[in-house]
Amino acid sequence: DFTHNKSLSEEEKNQIEDLINLEISKNTKSIIETMSMQEAQAKGAIAFFGDKYGDEVRVLNLGEGFSIELCGGTHVKETGQIEFMKITSETGISSGVRRIEAVTGEGAKNLLSNLKNSYLEVGKQLHVETKIDDPSNDLGLFRSLNEILLSISKEVSTSVDQVQNKINQLIDENRSLNEELGTKERSNKASDLLKAT
């Protein structure tokens, strides 16, 4: 959770991912201490909004320049054990407070694998060649695949819209032709009646 007055742009999310993944690659040692809530607050530790803490708290520090957090869930000895991180969502949880949710390690690998498979399947369905240039650059690949799938999604959406517009146009033309045909049939019947009399 963090304070910010608006949602993050894709560029800002990418910058955050890059910063975090750089820190992960540095393999910084985790500093975990248990202390009283007062001591933790004196050190500048940040408590999460709405969370309840006991008399003793676990304090996590993952490197200089980053916030010190009260934490009950990080169990890595060094940041390198995280492997890499990918943001999955960013939402507002209250006025001026945003929340980033992300996957790391195996979760990030699974997400990347699913995205690769989706990319290859979309290419197959569209009969276009798909290739993955550098599978070792997982985060870069993830972003590239995500951008490609978003682009394809927009194109497919546009194509669907174009088809729907054409269908609507044909329905309107059919309605007009039926009305015109009905008018001609009525006119022909009237003409036939006049001839018969």
Predicted feature residues:
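Acidic/histidine-rich
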Residues: 13-94, 162-197
